[in-house]
């Protein structure tokens, strides 16, 4: 059942240092591609792009 969930939990990882900082949910019907957001990375101490990891 969890594999076909419409709003699965995803993990966002920093593009620069690869640290997994955020967990969020996304709607798989509206956003089938990988999600990318600009968020604050505490390790880099700056706003960087965070991409969805699998």
Curated annotation (Swiss-Prot):
Q: Which terms does the record give in the GO molecular function aspect? A: structural constituent of ribosome
Where are stretches of biased composition, namely Basic and acidic residues? Answer: 30-39
Q: Report if keyword Secreted is assigned.
A: no
Q: Which UniProt keywords apply?
A: Ribonucleoprotein, Ribosomal protein
**InterPro entries named among the record's database cross-references:** Ribosomal_bL33 (IPR001705), Ribosomal_bL33_CS (IPR018264), Ribosomal_bL33_sf (IPR038584), Ribosomal_zn-bd (IPR011332)
Statement: the UniProt record of this protein carries the keyword Ribonucleoprotein: yes
| GO biological-process terms attached to the record | translation
- Stretches the record annotates as Disordered: 28-54
The terms describing its cellular component in GO are:
cytoplasm; ribonucleoprotein complex; ribosome
List the coiled-coil residues: none
Cross-referenced NCBIfam families: PRK00504.1 (NF001764), PRK00595.1 (NF001860), rpmG_bact (TIGR01023)
Family statement? Belongs to the bacterial ribosomal protein bL33 family.
**Protein name stated in the entry:** Large ribosomal subunit protein bL33B
**Organism of provenance:** Streptomyces griseus subsp. griseus (strain JCM 4626 / CBS 651.72 / NBRC 13350 / KCC S-0626 / ISP 5235)
